[in-house]
Amino acid sequence: MADKITSRSEDYSQWYIDLVRSAKLADYADVKGCMVIRPNGYAIWEKMQAALDRMFKETGHVNAYFPLFIPESFIAKEAEHIEGFAPECAVVTHGGGQELAEKLYVRPTSETIIWSSYKKWIQSYRDLPLLINQWANVVRWEMRTRLFLRTTEFLWQEGHTAHATHEEAQEEVLRMINVYKTFAEEYMALPVILGKKSDSEKFAGALETFCIEAMMQDGKALQAGTSHDLGQNFAKAFDCKFQTHEKTLEYVWATSWGVSTRLIGALIMAHSDDRGLVLPPRLATRQVVIIPILKGDKESVLHHADNIAAALTKAGISAFVDSSEQNSPGWKFAEYELQGIPLRLELGPRDIKNGMCVVARRDTLEKTEIALDDRLVMSINEILNDIQQDMFDAALRFRQERTVQVNNYDDFKVAVEKGFVIAHWDGTVETEAKIKEETKATIRVLPQEDDYCDTYGINEPGTCIYSGKPSARKVVFAKAY
């Protein structure tokens, strides 16, 4: 029940943990750093998977599965890549009762094991592009964990593609980060900033990393998806060449891109409240709960409730009736608010007599009456669409209110405690590191989209807030998960 949840104003971190556990989304596992994703949480992941998988296939990608274990010799082939992941790797040294001749790494990401296969599959330009996605689990040995946001084992998808030219690879990188942006905004109702990572924040082994960044209700940033231009690094490491139209041999060009179950954490922290989970209808497994008020003619009320649920289901709206009598309607209201059901429909004998019923929105808690007539399904669908759009609009307004521009370091240190800060940076790793050391804020994104850049004057030259040196552009700083 919602009374188990610490308020956001009292302790935001504890609120998040309380909500995840009270709504039965996930729980701590007996294995340190791992979590159990409970059915309510996994149902959200399945909705995310279904939408993303469809979007991947619409852009020409197919699914495959590669081994969990990666030979040490493969990992060592890409020096920058392994250097970036070495501290997080889990290593298998024994199997079958004896020490292994070669250590096996439990995948932290799959570039190396996948490129060992791509070398065998790619011979000619006719084999390109190769567009493969994998749904899998990965292991990164995290020291400080938080349910969904950072765990030792987590679920994700990772796309790995091979191309004949760098231009094609760059197009793929941008195509897929835009797929993620569309998913975040149209399904998660989560506004995101699309752009590039700084060199110190990019993926290990990448030429460039593009990302989408979202703001949580505490003003912190959360990286919601990444897409990497890997250049020819992995092709060279695995000697993956193809014969061109001109009969010459060239190394292929590579990309990788991925999102994970941390999106569930983002969904929770962006929209939920002190009563519990708030889900956008497009990611809610159950969109409408019908609660009969069982007074008077129970049979008639239940008959009407079942008919409404059937009509909604036929129209593609996920609806169900809670006709149990062991709990009061008030208890049910609170329970389904905790679970984040987007819309509640209350139906009693008086409602049936008057030809009207009460519907309550989860996002705003607003109650309205709608007619029990042949427009009911259309009315419910319109309300669900309104909820989806209103949740996005509310999150966008919040981000705008918590985004400030500063021109000096003193103002920066105050502003970065509350949200996103747009400021000039001199482009050096040294300045970036100093700011991170002193404030714990990092450069989240170098925005690329025209609308955002125009709104905040991102591409206007100026002076770095920290060093006082010339700056070619502004960037977005924030503390982050």
Swiss-Prot record:
<dbReference type="GO" id="GO:0005524">
    <property type="term" value="F:ATP binding"/>
</dbReference>
<dbReference type="InterPro" id="IPR002314">
    <property type="entry name" value="aa-tRNA-synt_IIb"/>
</dbReference>
<dbReference type="Pfam" id="PF09180">
    <property type="entry name" value="ProRS-C_1"/>
</dbReference>
<dbReference type="InterPro" id="IPR006195">
    <property type="entry name" value="aa-tRNA-synth_II"/>
</dbReference>
<dbReference type="InterPro" id="IPR002316">
    <property type="entry name" value="Pro-tRNA-ligase_IIa"/>
</dbReference>
<keyword id="KW-0436">Ligase</keyword>
<dbReference type="InterPro" id="IPR036621">
    <property type="entry name" value="Anticodon-bd_dom_sf"/>
</dbReference>
<keyword id="KW-0547">Nucleotide-binding</keyword>
<dbReference type="Pfam" id="PF03129">
    <property type="entry name" value="HGTP_anticodon"/>
</dbReference>
<protein>
    <recommendedName>
        <fullName>Proline--tRNA ligase</fullName>
        <ecNumber>6.1.1.15</ecNumber>
    </recommendedName>
</protein>
<dbReference type="InterPro" id="IPR045864">
    <property type="entry name" value="aa-tRNA-synth_II/BPL/LPL"/>
</dbReference>
<keyword id="KW-0963">Cytoplasm</keyword>
<comment type="similarity">
    <text>Belongs to the class-II aminoacyl-tRNA synthetase family. ProS type 3 subfamily.</text>
</comment>
<keyword id="KW-0067">ATP-binding</keyword>
<comment type="function">
    <text>Catalyzes the attachment of proline to tRNA(Pro) in a two-step reaction: proline is first activated by ATP to form Pro-AMP and then transferred to the acceptor end of tRNA(Pro).</text>
</comment>
<dbReference type="GO" id="GO:0017101">
    <property type="term" value="C:aminoacyl-tRNA synthetase multienzyme complex"/>
</dbReference>
<comment type="subunit">
    <text>Homodimer.</text>
</comment>
<dbReference type="InterPro" id="IPR033721">
    <property type="entry name" value="ProRS_core_arch_euk"/>
</dbReference>
<dbReference type="GO" id="GO:0005737">
    <property type="term" value="C:cytoplasm"/>
</dbReference>
<dbReference type="InterPro" id="IPR004499">
    <property type="entry name" value="Pro-tRNA-ligase_IIa_arc-type"/>
</dbReference>
<keyword id="KW-0648">Protein biosynthesis</keyword>
<dbReference type="GO" id="GO:0004827">
    <property type="term" value="F:proline-tRNA ligase activity"/>
</dbReference>
<dbReference type="Pfam" id="PF00587">
    <property type="entry name" value="tRNA-synt_2b"/>
</dbReference>
<dbReference type="InterPro" id="IPR004154">
    <property type="entry name" value="Anticodon-bd"/>
</dbReference>
<dbReference type="InterPro" id="IPR016061">
    <property type="entry name" value="Pro-tRNA_ligase_II_C"/>
</dbReference>
<dbReference type="GO" id="GO:0006433">
    <property type="term" value="P:prolyl-tRNA aminoacylation"/>
</dbReference>
<keyword id="KW-0030">Aminoacyl-tRNA synthetase</keyword>
<dbReference type="InterPro" id="IPR017449">
    <property type="entry name" value="Pro-tRNA_synth_II"/>
</dbReference>
